Structures are given as structure tokens and as C-alpha cells.
Swiss-Prot record:
Protein name from the UniProt record: Cytochrome c-554
Transmembrane stretches, start-end: none
Keywords: Electron transport, Heme, Iron, Metal-binding, Periplasm, Signal, Transport
Source organism (scientific name): Methylosinus trichosporium
Gene Ontology CC terms: periplasmic space
Every Cytochrome c domain range: 26-126
Pfam family, one: Cytochrom_C
PTM comment, free text: Binds 1 heme c group covalently per subunit.
Length: 132
């Protein structure tokens, strides 16, 4: 009986880890839909340009406050990070908590699925705006 309980526990842990990895991977198509909330200010793709907010092409591996020609807030200039999935998720969950004084008015994405999906969508775009 004890071996059955251990087997059940091991299977539960394996399932939880697998489920967590599925969330972490993100779905670019779902992320594109969530990104519609961001399009009022941000752009991606071959014709993207800075507008109310910086364009987000090539965000994966890009230094913060580095979109050429965009006038970032002083707190954002001082952030000094390189964007990766973990940094993006921490920021987009609550932008004003991560960067007090940011000009970004968006309140954030509380859903970890939405965060992962938007990252999966954005990270498809290279610095030239073409999908990788």
C-alpha cells in the first residue's frame, strides 16, 4: 500500500512539473490576442515604430530603455536590465511596482498564462520586426 501511495505522489509531482512547463512555454497565438490590450501604445512587426510607447521588436535579449528614438522616463533609463521572459513577466505583472515613476499607464497582467503568452508572441519578432 505504501508503494502505491509513493507512486501516486511521484505521478502527481511529475504532472505538476509538466503542467508548469506548459504554462511557461506560452502560446504565441493566444499572446497575440492578449497583446491587443497593448496595441494602443506599443507596436511590433516590420512596420513598427515608436509612438506613445516604444516599439517592442527584438525585445528578447534587448537592454531596457534601448528603443532608438524613444524618450524613456528617468526611472526606466535607470532600470538597467536585459529583457528575458522572467524580467518581462515581473514587469508586466505590475509595471508601476517594478519601475516606480514609469510613464506606462497599463495596470499589468495578473494572469501568469497571459504573461507567458504575450512573451511567446513578442519574442517571435527579431530586431528587424520579422518573425524568427
Amino acid at each position: 500500500m505504501k508503494s502505491i501511495s509513493m507512486l501516486t505522489l511521484a505521478a502527481s509531482v511529475a504532472f505538476a512539473v509538466t503542467a508548469g512547463q506548459a504554462v511557461a512555454a506560452g502560446d504565441p497565438a493566444a499572446g497575440e490576442k492578449v497583446f491587443n490590450k497593448c496595441k494602443a501604445c506599443h507596436q511590433v512587426g516590420e512596420t513598427a515604430k515608436n509612438a506613445v510607447a516604444p516599439e517592442l521588436n527584438g525585445i528578447d535579449g534587448r537592454k531596457s530603455a534601448s528603443a532608438e528614438g524613444y524618450n524613456y522616463s528617468e526611472p526606466f533609463k535607470a532600470l538597467g536590465i536585459t529583457w528575458d521572459e522572467a524580467q518581462f513577466k515581473e514587469f508586466i505583472k505590475n509595471p508601476k511596482a517594478k519601475v516606480p515613476g514609469t510613464k506606462m499607464i497599463f495596470p499589468g497582467l495578473s494572469s501568469e498564462n497571459d504573461q507567458a503568452n504575450v512573451w511567446a508572441y513578442l519574442s517571435q519578432f527579431g530586431a528587424d520586426g520579422k518573425k524568427k
